[in-house]
Amino acid sequence: MKVAVIGAAGGIGQALALLLKNRLPAGSDLALYDIAPVTPGVAADLSHIPTPVSIKGYCGEDPTPALEGADVVLISAGVARKPGMDRSDLFNINAGIVKSLAEKIAVTCPKACIGIITNPVNTTVAIAAEVLKKAGVYDKNKLFGVTTLDVIRSETFVAELKGKNPGEICVPVIGGHSGVTILPLLSQVEGVEFTAEEVAALTPRIQNAGTEVVEAKAGGGSATLSMGQAACRFGLSLVKALSGEKGVVECAYVEGNGEHARFFAQPILLGKNGVEEIQHYGELSTFEQDALDSMLDTLKADIKIGEEFIK
């Protein structure tokens, strides 16, 4: 199984590469690519970690050698948020990066599962889909917006609030991956009850957690380490499912049946071909239903920006 990390010299990419070097199954191949000349050095550094995962690093203008034969491609390339920016401010730079990478993937490894981390995810996933579609290789079961960070934040914050072990908390998060489009389904957390006040406080905290980190880093970056952890969790789940493991479920932003929007995050059963089944997320509370209804216009507008960028 070959996993390619694209944008591997960045804050997320290096953290993700470190975690994958430690946690991929024995015999896996890990390829790192970034435009930055330091990338082969990052691979050399990680190659000294004694795990049975082979690693190679590539730099320069062309990601092709890293993409060749890849089963999973995780894209974290692009610029990060600075204080005062929201995820949509990143669009002007990151849209072009995702477009050119998707064009390379379409030629080099069109059957790979692609996890997009590069923000704004609501929009960049639509860009990748349109590029792959134009190339005649789009498989909606193999393109994912990685929203796992919203899930791990939800698990962490719920566990903190309720004095529980975060490993025992499961919070489905639906919608998109920015601001109001992030909807944690707190009504569905098993074994935990919330007051209306707790839900009203916790929901925006989860939605704005990225901004919390951007401000705390005071211009020195965005959420790179927690995002690396989230991307690793999603990447490992994909690898397990592609290897034939059953019952692997993660929330992700995918093209489904279009019930709410063309792309929508919800729990996904992963399988040997990517998305095996889009699971229904169950009954919503009144608070959640209202939040869902009021965010859909924002989500649809984000998607449209991506589609129109390619047309």
Swiss-Prot record:
Record's keyword annotation contains NAD: yes
Out of the domains of life, which is the source? Bacteria
By its UniProt entry, which CDD domains does this protein fall under?
A: MDH_glyoxysomal_mitochondrial (cd01337)
Q: Point out the signal peptide segment.
A: none
Q: Which UniProt keywords apply?
A: NAD, Oxidoreductase, Tricarboxylic acid cycle
UniProt name for this protein: Malate dehydrogenase
List the GO molecular function terms: L-malate dehydrogenase (NAD+) activity
Q: How does it assemble?
A: Homodimer.
Q: Which Pfam families match?
A: Ldh_1_C (PF02866), Ldh_1_N (PF00056)
Residues engaged in binding substrate: R81, R87, N119, R153
Question: Is Membrane a UniProt keyword of this protein?
Answer: no
> According to its UniProt record, which residues of this chain constitute the active site?
H177
Classification via InterPro entries: L-lactate/malate_DH, Lactate/malate_DH_C, Lactate/malate_DH_N, Lactate_DH/Glyco_Ohase_4_C, Malate_DH_AS, Malate_DH_type1, Malate_DH_type1_bac, NAD(P)-bd_dom_sf
| HAMAP family xrefs | Malate_dehydrog_1
Indicate the family of this protein: Belongs to the LDH/MDH superfamily. MDH type 1 family.
Residue numbers binding NAD(+): G7, A8, A9, G10, G11, I12, G13, D34, N94, I117, T118, N119, M227
- Origin organism is Aliivibrio salmonicida (strain LFI1238)
Per the record, the GO terms for biological process are: malate metabolic process; tricarboxylic acid cycle
Q: Which Gene3D superfamilies match?
A: Lactate dehydrogenase/glycoside hydrolase, family 4, C-terminal, NAD(P)-binding Rossmann-like Domain
